[in-house]
Amino acid sequence: MAFDISVNASKTINALVYFSTQQNKLVIRNEVNDTHYTVEFDRDKVVDTFISYNRHNDTIEIRGVLPEETNIGCAVNTPVSMTYLYNKYSFKLILAEYIRHRNTISGNIYSALMTLDDLAIKQYGDIDLLFNEKLKVDSDSGLFDFVNFVKDMICCDSRIVVALSSLVSKHWELTNKKYRCMALAEHISDSIPISELSRLRYNLCKYLRGHTESIEDKFDYFEDDDSSTCSAVTDRETDV
């Protein structure tokens, strides 16, 4: 499978390469302005690429050959709809985007996730005090200290982890530490166990359907991508 990407030479290309333990795949994510490219392939595959500069049209050209069984995604300001909630892996991307872009993101799904802030405030009170005084998230070890703080909660209640992660990402974006947001988003979304991911997704669907007044933490749902609670939700109801 061959690919060819051309971008204006004056643009900045942000690339993130990581191994997803949940998907057991190597993931390459590129961002060129508002365009996001995601490539996923098995870790034992070889990817041949060639990057060159075309002086005739002042563009950077990336060409290569990928393994046949490769998932490629490309989105330019793509609206997020409930269809993404049907699949646990796609839902992970939703959480990652929510944590990473908390300051600028909008839409019904993200607005619903923002209601989880109340849980964090109820648990820890003044969030600014928690970040600045207790965790000192702006210090050199701030990212590491925050991850250590929430790691034990990930298997207990992912709702608070998602809330705190999005809030600290929002804080970093305002304090010129935006570079930490991507690392945190990828780590948190990849660290949440499948069971917790399914539970959060299930309860989020119920909330968006109007079946509950808040995103609950019930565990009456087992891993099943064909759950009627999720599949009954239409794009029309949740387009953002």
Swiss-Prot record:
InterPro entries listed in its UniProt record: Poxvirus_Bcl-2-like, Poxvirus_sf
Entry keyword Ribosomal protein: no
GO terms for cellular component: extrinsic component of cytoplasmic side of plasma membrane
Recorded family membership: Belongs to the orthopoxvirus OPG176 family.
Main function: BCL2-like protein which disrupts the host immune response by inhibiting the TLR4 signaling pathway leading to NF-kappa-B activation. Acts close to the plasma membrane and targets several host TIR-domain containing adapter proteins including MYD88, TIRAP, TRIF and TICAM2. In turn, blocks the host NF-kappa-B and TRIF-mediated IRF3 activation.
Name of the encoding gene: OPG176
Keyword Cell division among record annotations: no
Induction: Expressed in the early phase of the viral replicative cycle.
UniProt protein name: Protein OPG176
